[in-house]
Amino acid sequence: MELVLKDAQSALEVSETTFGRDFNEALVHQVVVAYAANARQGTRAQKTRAEVTGSGKKPWRQKGTGRARAGGVKGPIWRGGGVTFAAKTQDHSQKVNKKMYRGALKSILSELVRQDRLVVVESFSVEAPKTKELKAKLKAMNLEDVLIVTSEVDENLFLAARNLYKVDVRDVAGLDPVSLIAFNTVLVTADAVKQIEEMLA
């Protein structure tokens, strides 16, 4: 199959298995959920009454004071006491096979092509790290909510896009399923398309 280059009167020959496969919604959902889960730290930690520092001594005698009976000062109803159902450190990570991960990326890319949301250009760069310059370039192409994918890290482009709302710059190695579906349009250079094909082959 062919992808038309927006900035040149030519087309780029690409693999049907990468850019023309059927959309597998269940697979994409599973991979996106796993990706988000793997980004979680899971480092929250609270103490139960057994773990709180403090005395185990009975604060006052059982009878005769007129106060409610109490067996200790570390219970959940006491200030400084433990938490009833204390949150513990948790590993939220989910295993995703390489084949599934690549399959999800292919599915997303193919759907972007079908919906005309994947824009391929010969090259894309800015002369200086100026947001104004990048904004003007995107406006000329009628693009706002866009993910720019390049073959390698472009420092000028990254710095120019950093302060723009709903604009992000990634190299092929930094591509992930969440960023691909988070933007309305994905702008990819021809070199990046070839790298994506090699990566997902």
Curated annotation (Swiss-Prot):
The keyword Protease does not apply. Keywords: Ribonucleoprotein, Ribosomal protein, RNA-binding, rRNA-binding. The keyword RNA-binding applies. InterPro entries: Ribosomal_uL4, Ribosomal_uL4-like, Ribosomal_uL4_dom_sf. GO terms for molecular function: rRNA binding; structural constituent of ribosome. Pfam families: Ribosomal_L4. It comes from the Bacteria. GO terms for cellular component: ribonucleoprotein complex; ribosome. GO terms for biological process: translation. Residues 45-71 are annotated as: Disordered. Part of the 50S ribosomal subunit. PANTHER family: 50S RIBOSOMAL PROTEIN L4, LARGE RIBOSOMAL SUBUNIT PROTEIN UL4M. One of the primary rRNA binding proteins, this protein initially binds near the 5'-end of the 23S rRNA. It is important during the early stages of 50S assembly. It makes multiple contacts with different domains of the 23S rRNA in the assembled 50S subunit and ribosome. Forms part of the polypeptide exit tunnel. Belongs to the universal ribosomal protein uL4 family. This is Large ribosomal subunit protein uL4.
